[in-house]
Structures are given as C-alpha cells and as structure tokens.
A protein has these predicted regions:
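Bacterial N-terminal signal peptides
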Residues: 7-15
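Alpha-carbonic anhydrase
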Residues: 4, 19-262
Length: 262
C-alpha cells in the first residue's frame, strides 16, 4: 500500500513540474518585445523586432513631400473615384494600443487606376506622419482601402487646429476607450465631409507605416488640411500613445506627383 502511495506522489510531482514548465513557456511568449513608438521598441528598432517585415525596404513611408520636386499631373490621368455612400456603416471602434481605429462594414470603396479598393478602416496619427515642405501637422487621418489582390490604397487627410468638426465630434463621442478594448457602433456617417474642399492631392508608391511595413501601398495625400478644434485634438491625444508617428523615410528616387483638378 505504501509503495502505491509513493508511486502516486512521484507522478504528482512530475505533473506539477511539467505544468510549471508549460506556464513558464507561455509567460515568455506573451512577453516577447512588441513594436511601439517609444524606447527600445520604437520605430528605430522595428527592423530588429519584426524579423520578416519590410521595415528596412527601399520604398518606405511616410516621407517629406517637397512641392518643387513633385511632378504635376491632371486629375483625369490618375482616375481616382471615391465611391462612398452618404451613409457609410461604421461597425466598431478599437483602441489597439497604437491608435484609435474605426472599422467599417463592407460597401464603400474607391477606384484608383482602374482597380477597386474597399474601405476597411480609418485610424489616426498625432502629430502627422507625412510632412509637406518639412511641416508636420497636428493630426493625420488614414483611410485604409484594400483590393482583392491584397494591395492597399491609403487616403491621407492632414488636419490643423481651428474650428470644431462635426464629423470629429461624432467620432469622439465613442471616446474614451481603454487600450485593447473594442466598442460596437453599428451607426452610419457621411465620410465625404471628412475631405477638404480643395481635392488636389499628392501620390506616390510606398508602404504601411506600421509593421510589417508592407511595400504595396498607393498613397493619396490631400494637399489642403482640414480644420479640427484644439479640444478635439487633445481628446484624441488622450486616448493614444504620445507621438504615434513614424519618422520620415528616404525617398530613394521615387517620384511624387501632384494631382490637380481642372
């Protein structure tokens, strides 16, 4: 009987040791370095952290756009069509620890160079990631569109401080939101009111501005900023990491076009 008890005790000890080992492995995996905008995991270290990314590529974003170096083209040559309805359906809002992100139901899209890109989400960078003639704006909004071939077209709207924006008031009505939290929205809004009155824009080929920094992005950056209030900027800022932007990347002989309407 004592031998039987001893065997049970040995098996129990083996089992406990095994469980402790498993828990240690899980703990280690959960605490692997993850990219951020600060310290040892800031953009300068993304290449080290994200081993299989394009973050060290030659077509990276964002960039500094210098007006005198851009190539003038006509709007009709770029074939950009914004196919948004007056009631774009917002599905949910998430604080993913990097930005505030609004996700959309399927339906809205743009057509760029003959290909359809479907609107999936928009998020914010404060201050802006792209700069124009060295000027960094208080805020940049990215409207992310994806094609069936998994290519991206991102429309960027820069913002400066001034009067209140009705659309921003709507977005911020869902704040505050804690990190790693999602709120269901299931409401609609007219996103076309987000764009500046002057529709001239810059275009160039680049990458996602966050890991994995994939280099299959068409960038459309409206030249004229929109106006939002100081309070709106601060409210958004309080729900995001400080300075959640990536620094200017080398142009590496890429061409930037300025597209104007006739």
């Amino acid at each position: 009987m004592n031998r039987f008890v001893a065997i049970i005790v040995i098996f129990a000890l083996i089992s406990i040791t095994s469980c402790k080992s498993d828990k240690t492995e899980t703990h280690t995996k959960e605490h692997q370095p993850h990219w951020s905008y600060d310290g040892e995991t800031s953009p300068e270290h993304w290449v080290e952290i994200e081993k299989n990314s394009d973050c060290d590529g030659n077509r990276q974003s964002p960039i500094n756009i210098i007006d005198i170096d851009t190539k003038p083209t006509q709007q009709k040559d770029t074939l950009l069509k914004v196919l948004y309805t007056p009631k774009t359906a917002l599905k949910q809002v998430t604080n993913n620890g990097h930005s505030i992100q609004f996700d959309f139901e399927a339906g809205d899209s743009i057509q760029y160079h003959g290909e359809i890109y479907h609107l999936s989400q928009l998020h914010f960078h404060e201050p802006s990631e792209h700069t124009i003639n060295g000027i960094r704006y208080p805020l940049e909004i990215h409207l992310v569109h994806k094609s069936k071939s998994n290519a991206y077209t991102v429309m960027s709207v820069l913002a400066k401080e001034g009067a209140k924006s009705q659309l921003f008031e709507f977005f911020e009505s869902f704040l505050p939101i804690k990190v790693n939290t999602t709120k269901e929205i299931n409401q609609s809004s007219d996103l076309t009111t987000l764009f500046p009155k002057n529709k001239n824009f810059y275009t160039y080929g680049g990458s996602l501005t966050t890991p994995p920094c994939t280099e299959n992005v068409n960038w459309i950056i409206f030249k004229e900023p929109i106006i939002v209030s100081v309070d709106e900027v601060l409210k958004l800022k309080n729900n995001m990491p400080k300075n959640n932007y990536r620094n200017e990347q080398p142009l590496n002989n890429r061409e930037v076009s300025i597209n104007t309407f006739q």
